[in-house]
Amino acid sequence: IHHPHSQIVGFKDYDYHQDIKPFHFVGPSIIEEDGLTVNLSQRPIIGFYEVNLILKDRGKLGKFVRYMQLTADYFMHSFVSFNDSYNIFFYDFPADDALYVKIIPRFLTNPLYVGYMIPQIANGGHSARFIHALQQRLHEV
């Protein structure tokens, strides 16, 4: 999809806590304030540049959101010339009251995998057509 859009995804039968852990939000500090942290993930979910924002003091929500905006703007206008998109993912952890956010420059990868390690697979009909077509091609050998 090549147009600006927002998408909210809810999971009925999936708990991302099985795959996403607090260590995914640790890394070299970009900004460190009392109750608010911005860092570069040293254990990214998908790789390279994942900016983590962690809000522990809800009184700093305005500043937190501004840091989110500035990080997204950086990825769009100052990061690399061929990047024109980003994803923002929100997380919580039951043992922690903090709000966790990951902002990731968007390249050609399924966003559900980028944020939650959920691989995208084709539905049964598409899979069957693919298998049939490839079988036909391989049987030509």
List each language-model region with its residue ranges:
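HIT superfamily nucleotide-processing domains
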Residues: 1-141
